[in-house]
Amino acid sequence: ETGCGKSTLMKIIAGFIEPDSGEVEIGQTIKIGYFGQEVDIEPELRVIDYVKEAAEFVRTADGLVSASAMLERFLFPPEQQYSPVGKLSGGEKRRLYLLRVLMSAPNVLILDEPTNDLDVETLAILEDYLDGYDGIVITVSHDRYFLDRIAKRIFAFEGAGKIVQYEGGYTDYMNKRQQPASGKTVSENASSTGASASGAQGNTASDGTDSCLLYTSPSPRD
């Protein structure tokens, strides 16, 4: 389903929206990077300057990498890096926005429909980057192949405040949801244990193909 609050939940976790009730507790060491569906970049800004506003270097699985080298990795050749952002296509702007989020070196990465408007090459680069990413990934996506590629756990919101946890990716979720009592209800557990974004572990996916899926994290002791 669409319009059931998946993106709103991501924005609440990221701190862009206040919840109607309750509190969101973020650990002191948590640094959230948010990749949303809207891209708003000053058109006069140079490509490389936009990325350097986040950081000039970022530590990856390959070591410390410069902004220019990361731009090349994300398909922006040196001659394009000094062009104004306004000359980029919509897909290129979204790719640049994604890179800037990654350059900020978050340890919790929120991806809201990350595969929208990304070409196949960029998607492959993102998936490879996530393979070596040491932090937490929380994503909303209708792309079942992407979910199977990166997700280790899915939380399904099944109405009336019921949240069911399924281990595995999208295919595992579809198979297990056909089995009686195959999922673990976590909504009551989350409220009783003080769940927060800081307790998240592993890559978590949210998908709205058949039911509204959203993220909630168990406490670290679970």
Placement of each model-derived feature along the sequence:
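ABC ATP-binding cassette signature C-motif
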Residues: E1-L213, S217
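A short, hydrophobic C-terminal helix/tail in secreted or cell-surface proteins
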Residues: P218-D222
